[in-house]
Amino acid sequence: MKRTYQPSVVRRKRTHGFLVRMKTRGGRAVIRARRAKGRHRLAV
């Protein structure tokens, strides 16, 4: 059986990257929440 996680930098950036997060209202909310919490890594 093939495992579900097949890492790819391109796919990772395109689905979870900072720019993608900033595109939608919900994504911006995620970034805002992570900033408020004090996360060092805001996206990916």
From Swiss-Prot:
GO terms for biological process: translation. It holds the Pfam family Ribosomal_L34. Coiled coil: none annotated. Disulfide bonds: none annotated. InterPro entries: Ribosomal_bL34, Ribosomal_bL34_CS. One of its GO terms (cellular component) is ribonucleoprotein complex. It comes from the Bacteria. GO terms for molecular function: structural constituent of ribosome. Keywords: Ribonucleoprotein, Ribosomal protein. Belongs to the bacterial ribosomal protein bL34 family. This is Large ribosomal subunit protein bL34.
